[in-house]
């Protein structure tokens, strides 16, 4: 909420995006990370940031910054097996403060940390309400806005609006561009220092194929050619077996996305998929 102090532990891509959003919503934000380049990046965006590796005690810093009150909330976006992160999050929180885990950390919690301050702890479920709900994600059954304000879709819409309005800067977070053939440079070391966001660059002259040739099947001359639009369950379970039984020649199988058509075309022995 407006005026609250929130600590973001871990200033990677998610941490820096979250810190900017919190600041845009009127929160006082403190960032914590051991990578000085990321600390400097946060500072360049007006975020108070500290590096524990440089001798700064983050718990003491938060206490001093808040006048001994503690942080209203702690957002953990770090990735580490250490249990010390959750302990420090409790220590820097005010009484009845909130801790939200977005990253992956060691969770050997101490009961006293939570009991004495009546802290609340929550694990974030990625995109928001609707995640892992088949009715929402696959069937398009939305939640009423009056009862569920922030769903996956509404969260994404808000982020896109924040980017377009300039209140969220993501372009400056791109630290490297790598050719697709060299993708291992990114995925081989996801935690290298200084790396925040990476872009895979596809060849500019690469040919985009909308029709994929499946095989070199030989067909008997004189028979008609059949094209199929739709590669769903009915086509796979009913239509294709009937055509195969009749030794029909399938010239094309088409689907909206192309991938399902390609898979079914290989199974059915069709010539092309699109």
What do these predicted ranges mean?
Residues 24-28, 95, 245-250:
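Conserved S-adenosyl-L-methionine
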Residues 1-55, 60:
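Mid-domain Rossmann-like dinucleotide-binding core that forms the NAD(H)/NADP(H) cofactor-binding site
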Residues 40, 64, 68, 73-75, ...:
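C-terminal capping/lid region of NAD(P)-dependent oxidoreductase domains
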Residues 208-268:
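N-terminal Rossmann-like dinucleotide-binding module
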Residues 33-34, 125, 252-256:
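Conserved acidic E/D residue at the C-terminus of a beta-strand in Rossmann-like folds
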Residues 82-158, 206-221, 238:
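Glycine-rich phosphate-binding loop and adjacent beta-alpha segment
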Residues 48-54, 174-182, 272-274:
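Short acidic-hydrophobic, aromatic-tinged amphipathic segments that line or gate anion-handling sites
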Residues 10-12, 104, 231-232:
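Glycine-rich Rossmann-fold phosphate-binding loop(s) that bind the pyrophosphate
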